[in-house]
Regions:
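Nucleotide-activated chemistry modules centered on ATP-dependent adenylation/adenylyltransferase
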Residues: 1-255, 259-271
């Protein structure tokens, strides 16, 4: 995905393709009724179905990376940390004498560790050679060492000295170009999400969306394009919607569903 100019979320992909399916399958082999993880999220039973909600402690809410779990899977899962805060968790761990009680929170990708993910990726995929960094008028302002190292909205590593901060506004994979511009050029109001899944049946009222992990909820309307693709229209334009990230839809604290942000509509908006 990095070589396609997309910005994936490894935690979502891990939960979707690796962690939970195998975890639940193994639990069944051991005759266990449920599995439990330390994610900050809540499961709420409603009539005959199960809902996924944001954690009570919103500072650590991880429901975004769990959006692919449907009601059937939620029935087999417990999230015991969903109703308590991180300080409370630390205190419980300290009382039990656990050495990790006051371990610093990790912001790293677990299988990369403290290394720069760009170096990790460049050793594992055939990345493009150097290319141009240009503005919206195709004026050359610099060069880059591979599109895998850039994401929409990125400021770090972007050539400056032009009177104002510049950001990555578009990644042209075919021509190996990085486009940069002002923050205003990052504004997006409509985009598509694909490979969409829902926790349960969907209601279309009072919806909002997060366009990346722990971002603010933005009120939105959604419209079905086909069985797995939906158009998102934001009530208010937002900045830095990056193809490859996930758009996760909420109804207040209830997680409705989500899908991967595509580049199709984004490119039309930028132009």
């Amino acid at each position: 995905m990095y070589s396609q100019g997309l910005t994936p979320n490894p935690c979502v992909e891990c939960n979707r393709s690796v962690k939970f399916d195998h975890f639940i399958d193994q639990a069944k082999k051991l005759n266990c009724e449920k599995v439990a993880t330390g994610h900050y999220a809540k499961i709420v039973k409603n009539s005959d179905s199960f809902e996924l909600h944001k954690a009570d402690y919103l500072d650590k809410d991880q429901s975004y990376v769990l959006h692919m779990l449907d009601s059937k899977k939620l029935a087999q899962i417990e999230f015991p940390l969903g109703t308590i805060s991180k300080p409370e968790v630390r205190q419980i761990a300290a009382t039990l004498g656990l050495k990790t009680a006051f371990k610093k929170d990790s912001q790293d990708i677990c299988f990369v560790g403290k290394k720069d993910y760009r170096n990790f990726v460049s050793k594992r995929i055939d990345v493009s050679s150097k290319g141009l960094i240009v503005d919206k008028h195709e004026n050359e302002v610099g060069t880059h060492g591979g599109i895998h190292a850039y994401t929409i909205g990125q400021r770090k590593g972007v050539p400056g000295g032009q009177g104002e901060a510049k950001y990555v506004t578009k990644i042209d994979v075919q021509n190996n170009k990085i486009y940069i511009g002002s923050k205003d050029e990052l504004t997006t109001k409509k985009f598509l999400i694909e490979d969409v899944s829902f926790v349960d049946s969907i209601e279309y009222d009072n919806l909002s969306i997060q366009t990346r992990y722990n971002s603010d909820d933005v009120p939105c309307n959604i419209q079905k394009v086909d069985e797995s693709t939906y158009q998102i229209e934001l009530k208010n334009p937002t900045l830095g919607v990056a193809p490859g990230q996930f758009g996760v839809i909420y109804q207040d604290t209830k997680l409705v569903g989500g899908g991967r942000i595509t580049s199709k509509v984004l490119e039309e908006v930028y132009e």
